[in-house]
Amino acid sequence: MRAPGIAAGPLYNPVISIGNRFGDPSMNHPVRQLASDNYSGICPEALDYLLAANQGDASAYGNDDWTQRAADRFRDLFETDCEVFFVFNGTAANSLSLAALCQSYHSVICHETAHIETDECGGPEFASNGSKLLLAKGERGKLDPVEVERLITRRSDIHYPKPKVVSITQATELGTVYMLDELEALRELADQYKLKIHMDGARFANALVTLNETPARLTWQAGVDVLCLGGTKNGMAVGEAILFFDRELATDFAYRCKQAGQLASKMRFIAAPWLGLLETGAWLRNARHANEMAAYLAQRLRAIPGLQPLFPCQANSVFLELPSPVIQALRAEGWQFYTFIGVGGVRLMCSWNTTREAIDQFISDLERMLA
């Protein structure tokens, strides 16, 4: 049963009649944005399961059927008996999982544009009581194994934070994806030096549909030890899943979640929307649609003389350089987008509910301002 005022459909628009119901018409004002998949509302499948989970009472702190079913569904999809945890957001997922892999005197090797370095306010260092992030270079947002090995072998004395983890962002902060052979090369390097592999998969579903591989093939079969899987950016209101493919690494992890304020008492309201995404296949449909819209946006941009995306469009974002007056003019028209992500330029992000009409309107406004 759907909530009143919510329309069904593959491109369900979350801007519903809430404002009228609560006496504030301004809440109906649509946002003109290609800023972030975090701006988007809840997709119908996640919302349906959330409402279903709200029928009656259920045990607290994850001891409910919804949480068990969602965890089991992850195990089926990833074809392994992994440990599954649910937390509220990606910063907590990354920070707590990295803390589980490290002691305070260890270090984590990540790309210089990785979210754990640029956008988590020191969360990984805080959760681990001081594990240091070592920054590696690499083209298009991806780790270069040569650079990773340089950081591993640069020093081995007692004064240097001992490398313990390689963190991979899939898809990357620049909208590119690691190919299977690139993942395997990093795993081979990690094995050589006895390091663990952490994957920040806030947009893992976008990479998955691009590569047309199985979830297992792109994670534990490629050597990933822990995956932080994003739901918030893919149609959920809140909630990420942490999958430990090496179950021993999850020892006492529930205590970390509780201590960090990440043990949801009504966990079914995180788990049920996840189940909705997974059981209906919406997690892949949503990601595929977002990717297709980004590809369409990149195509329209390339048709404008003098404009060229900065990186290959392999997931759901497009980066490009625009003159400052054009950026200001677009914002004056009400368009919202980011200019502080990655290596600069404008980031345009598509989501599960981005429409061609919105992209066409953006292109029309952009062409007018460039004229």
Q: Which residue stretches match the model-derived regions?
A:
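Short, Lys/Arg-enriched N-terminal segments with co-localized hydrophobic residues
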Residues: 8-26
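Conserved PLP-enzyme active-site core in the AAT-like
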Residues: 28-333, 339-354, 362-370
